[in-house]
From Swiss-Prot:
This is Pepsin A. The active site is at D78, D261. Its EC number is 3.4.23.1. Transmembrane segments: none annotated. Keywords: Aspartyl protease, Digestion, Disulfide bond, Hydrolase, Phosphoprotein, Protease, Secreted, Zymogen. The lineage of its organism: Eukaryota, Metazoa, Chordata, Craniata, Vertebrata. It is found in: Secreted. SUPFAM superfamilies: Acid proteases. The modification Phosphoserine is found at S114. GO terms for cellular component: extracellular region. One of its GO terms (molecular function) is aspartic-type endopeptidase activity. The keyword Phosphoprotein applies. Shows particularly broad specificity; although bonds involving phenylalanine and leucine are preferred, many others are also cleaved to some extent. It catalyses: Preferential cleavage: hydrophobic, preferably aromatic, residues in P1 and P1' positions. Cleaves 1-Phe-|-Val-2, 4-Gln-|-His-5, 13-Glu-|-Ala-14, 14-Ala-|-Leu-15, 15-Leu-|-Tyr-16, 16-Tyr-|-Leu-17, 23-Gly-|-Phe-24, 24-Phe-|-Phe-25 and 25-Phe-|-Tyr-26 bonds in the B chain of insulin.
Length: 372
């Protein structure tokens, strides 16, 4: 049994790379930016909707190795999806040529299957094949892990993506093609001592962020963990009691559903509610479609408070206003994701940077505590 610590590195996001290459406007024009379609899934189909635009602002990445000897890949550890996939040598899309590509012929432990994988994005689909191989993650060997080898990847914009692939950490029920997720396979093999993993995201430093499989490291948080039951086992979905600013309800007055998603960088919610919040904090759209705010307002704005399972989780303006190159932008994003349990909110990295998060599969609960 070992504790598996995977360091995450904070790098420039896809959005920042697009801006620096003068490609953001073209991207926004050609990719109707629908963050929500990652979460809209027909349970009956095996096609999962997961637009890559969701990963536009993601900044935290980890390295895994696949095969024997290991071939290294930079991936997003994403609690909002469940598949592992990386580019393969069978992919000649422009995006693949600029990234590490898995070569099955170079691995002595690779096992092919005849199964295919298709993950639909907002603008096309990532199609590929499923294979089995050993995945090296945080110093342990996850053997016989099923994963996707991409053959086509949508959109040349992925050429600029700072990651090769995605490692999904949500429940098996939302895995495309019914593929066993990495954490499930690791737990089933008895490679970690507890059926849980935890995440710490550092605010500023490039290093320091970490995903820990099978353990809770109390040095990352202060006080004690508060536990919240998972309301629907698919995403890491929980019930939020209320969302307030200055003691006034600004959204979710009758309770709402939220998912805790490391693969989404912002705080997202229904467009009407979010536009109320944007006007409340004085944020507005500039000519390029960015929602900007005066940097001087960071000192005067109130916390936004999420009450979850009776406990208040304040997120201060220094967290929900993002500063980059002297420009301040809102960390709130509107999207409409209606589910049978109502409209979904997404507590992304803006929230997780404030709260050390434990994803407890064994007890179907999430633990939250302020970061140390």
């Amino acid at each position: 049994m070992s504790v598996v610590k995977i360091p995450l590195v904070k790098k420039k996001s896809l959005r920042q790379n697009l801006i620096e290459n003068g490609k953001l406007k073209e991207f926004m024009r050609t990719h109707k930016y629908n963050l929500g379609s990652k979460y809209i899934r027909e349970a009956a189909t095996l096609v999962s909707e997961q637009p890559l635009q969701n990963y536009l602002d993601t900044e935290y990445f980890g390295t895994i190795g696949i095969g024997t000897p290991a071939q290294d890949f930079t991936v997003i550890f994403d609690t909002g999806s469940s598949n592992l996939w990386v580019p393969s040598i069978y992919c000649s899309s422009e995006a693949c040529t600029n990234h590490n590509r898995f070569n099955p012929q170079d691995s002595s432990t690779y096992e092919a299957t005849s199964e295919t994988l298709s993950i639909t994005y907002g603008t096309g689909s990532m199609t590929g094949i499923l294979g089995y191989d050993t995945v090296q993650v945080g110093g342990i060997s996850d053997t016989n892990q099923i994963f996707g080898l991409s053959e086509t990847e949508p959109g040349s914009f992925l050429y600029y993506a700072p990651f090769d692939g995605i490692l999904g950490l949500a429940y098996p029920s939302i895995s495309s093609s019914g593929a066993t997720p990495v954490f499930d396979n690791i737990w089933d093999q008895g490679l970690v001592s507890q059926d849980l993993f935890s995440v710490y995201l550092s605010s500023n430093e490039e290093s320091g962020s970490v995903v820990i499989f099978g353990d809770i490291d109390s040095s990352y948080y202060s006080g004690s963990l508060n536990w919240v039951p998972v309301s629907v086992e698919g995403y890491w979905q929980i019930t939020v009691d209320s969302i307030t600013m200055n003691g006034e309800s600004i959204a979710c007055s009758d309770g709402c559903q939220a998912i805790v998603d490391t693969g989404t960088s912002l705080l997202a919610g229904p467009t009407t509610a979010i536009s109320n919040i944007q006007s409340y904090i004085g944020a507005s759209e500039d000519s390029s479609g960015e929602v900007v705010i005066s940097c001087s307002s960071i000192d005067s704005l109130p916390d936004i408070v999420f009450t979850i399972n009776g406990v208040q989780y304040p997120v201060p303006p220094s967290a929900y206003i993002l500063q980059s190159n002297g420009i301040c932008s809102s960390g709130f994003e509107g999207m409409d994701i209606s589910t049978s349990s109502g409209d979904l909110w997404i507590l992304g990295d803006v929230f997780i940077r404030q709260y050390f998060t434990v994803f407890d599969r064994g007890n179907n609960q999430i633990g939250l505590a302020p970061v140390a």
